[in-house]
């Protein structure tokens, strides 16, 4: 018996196990007509199977699709820009920025050995592993950054936001993926870690926006992510700039939290 991710790689269905994992996570792998949801699924190689694997993701992680939606909705063009990706993980956001023409991306993550191998080798990517973004400074990111993107888990963004202003250009933009499950109190989180109540989702957006405003970053645009989180949570993509905006509450109120 062979793991499905290994089987896909060895038999030419995927170029690497990372690619196989992405296809599995996206629900793009079937064995005998059954969608495979786990890379640990075992295939009996002594039996002939009808295996289908579609590598339809344009980025190394599904997060790239979320950032793509934000860049389009907010009319932000990374072409020729210096960027920072906080919470880079496998590099979905970083990959999206590069494919949109970014000339340099600081890929920052507190973990290690997560960034896609091809991205590690890309000369435009500065991989900063084992870096706690709560202590981000100009020594860690020496360049003035045009675009900061952020997708962090298991920590409130409010602990990182105070560090952003020192590396962001005066005319720069900050795009963040707001995950209510990491911004709300325990009372808001239900079974499976899901935040179901619209009022709690709204509270999460307001909390992040308030933290940004306290640090000179103001909400300019906001959308509901077209893709839910891996755990099924509704998420939001927000755009902040250093330009004061008196319409923040109107922007917040214009989004569906149901």
Q: Where on the chain are the PLM-derived regions?
A:
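Short beta-strand element of Class I
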Residues: 29, 103-106
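Conserved class I S-adenosyl-L-methionine
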Residues: 79-89
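Conserved SAM-binding loop of SAM-dependent methyltransferases across substrates and taxa
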Residues: 90-101
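Short, glycine-/aromatic-enriched active-site segment of Class I SAM-dependent methyltransferases
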Residues: 180-197
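S-adenosyl-L-methionine
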Residues: 106-159
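A short glycine-rich, Lys/Arg-flanked "PGG" loop and its adjoining helix->strand segment in the class I
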Residues: 158-175
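A basic, amphipathic helix-loop patch mediating RNA/tRNA/ribosome contacts
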Residues: 1-48
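Core SAM-dependent methyltransferase catalytic element
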Residues: 227-257
